């Protein structure tokens, strides 16, 4: 019996990393310009049974701006490109240091919609300047959204009230009384894929524990529920501060750990601090 061995021509190196269980593969696209970014390839790689398995794929690219250190691209597990990922930003910062792409511990990184400032702290945590939260809904969702209205939607026999915020990507935020018993996956999927959000939306379920602490679960568009969502933590805290429910410094309890969010409100920038972990390096063939 003869077995035909198929040799695939493109070898791609990657690092597996995670921020509180929100996991990624990161690829240095500055050195590996042949990596083809297609939805089909990303979906195959993200499969946790037949591929590597991850929530998002992150690319490190050269910046076209001399004042920016790197360009940061983010692809969800379903292959769609998005503009923000807070946990990914922390892993991005650790990656470029570990791979000696820079010696800087303060990095200026562009995305498709904004510029992030990433600070790698001496204790190994990363503090991310996430910019200014946006509550101007027409800037986020277009002219069909009514500003300052009570947003609600019917799900089975109940009415769900929600708020909308952007922190570089869109978030729908729902306050709940008992996060452990709430049907996060069912309602998360329903809202995330609803026709009122043609590009999808991240759905955040928030239980306010005190003025300086919340519990949070997030159903991410194009991924599903994740163990943590950095931008979701930022958006949820920003809304709580704006509504007077929270103080300016808040601990966010996610399924797999804790993030610290600091925002003084108004036009001030919001800061997120948390860990980033390198798991292993590997390669795959295409």
UniProtKB/Swiss-Prot annotation:
Q: What is this protein called?
A: Diaminopimelate epimerase
For this entry, list what GO says about its biological process.
lysine biosynthetic process via diaminopimelate
Q: Which organism is it from?
A: Buchnera aphidicola subsp. Baizongia pistaciae (strain Bp)
The EC number(s) attached to this protein equal 5.1.1.7
Site annotation (Could be important to modulate the pK values of the two catalytic cysteine residues) points to 171, 220
**Protein function:** Catalyzes the stereoinversion of LL-2,6-diaminopimelate (L,L-DAP) to meso-diaminopimelate (meso-DAP), a precursor of L-lysine and an essential component of the bacterial peptidoglycan.
Q: Tell me which residues this entry annotates as catalytic.
A: 85, 229
Q: What is the lineage of its organism?
A: Bacteria, Pseudomonadati, Pseudomonadota, Gammaproteobacteria, Enterobacterales
Return the annotated site residues (Important for dimerization).
280
| Protein's pathway | Amino-acid biosynthesis; L-lysine biosynthesis via DAP pathway; DL-2,6-diaminopimelate from LL-2,6-diaminopimelate: step 1/1
Principal location listed in the UniProt entry:
cytoplasm
Reaction catalyzed: (2S,6S)-2,6-diaminopimelate = meso-2,6-diaminopimelate
Q: Where in the cell is it found?
A: Cytoplasm
Q: Its encoding gene is what?
A: dapF
Q: Which UniProt keywords apply?
A: Amino-acid biosynthesis, Cytoplasm, Isomerase, Lysine biosynthesis
Q: By its UniProt entry, which NCBIfam families does this protein fall under?
A: DapF
């Amino acid at each position: 019996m003869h077995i035909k061995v198929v040799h695939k021509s493109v070898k791609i190196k990657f690092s597996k990393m995670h921020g509180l269980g929100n996991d990624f593969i990161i690829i240095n696209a500055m050195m590996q310009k042949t990596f083809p970014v297609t939805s089909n390839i990303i979906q195959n790689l993200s499969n946790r049974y037949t591929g590597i398995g991850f929530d998002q794929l992150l690319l490190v690219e050269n910046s076209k701006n001399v004042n920016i250190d790197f360009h940061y691209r983010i692809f969800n597990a379903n292959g769609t490109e998005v503009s923000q990922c807070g946990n990914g930003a922390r892993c991005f910062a650790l990656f470029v240091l570990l791979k000696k792409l820079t010696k800087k511990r303060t990095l200026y990184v562009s995305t498709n919609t904004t510029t992030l400032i990433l600070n790698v702290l001496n204790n190994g945590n990363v503090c991310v300047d996430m910019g200014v939260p946006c509550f101007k809904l027409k800037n986020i969702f277009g002219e069909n959204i009514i500003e300052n209205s009570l947003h609600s939607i019917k799900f089975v026999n109940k009415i769900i009230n929600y708020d909308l915020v952007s922190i570089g990507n869109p978030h729908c935020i729902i306050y709940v009384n008992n996060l452990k018993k709430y049907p996060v996956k069912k309602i998360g999927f329903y809202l995330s894929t609803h026709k009122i959000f043609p590009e999808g939306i991240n759905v955040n379920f928030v239980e306010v524990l005190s003025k300086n602490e919340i519990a949070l679960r997030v159903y991410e568009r194009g991924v599903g529920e994740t163990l943590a969502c950095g931008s979701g933590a930022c958006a949820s805290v920003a809304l709580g501060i704006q509504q007077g429910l929270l103080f300016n410094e808040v601990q966010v309890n996610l399924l797999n750990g804790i993030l610290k969010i600091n925002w003084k409100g108004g036009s001030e920038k919001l800061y997120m601090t948390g860990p980033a972990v390198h798991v292993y390096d590997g390669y795959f063939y295409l």
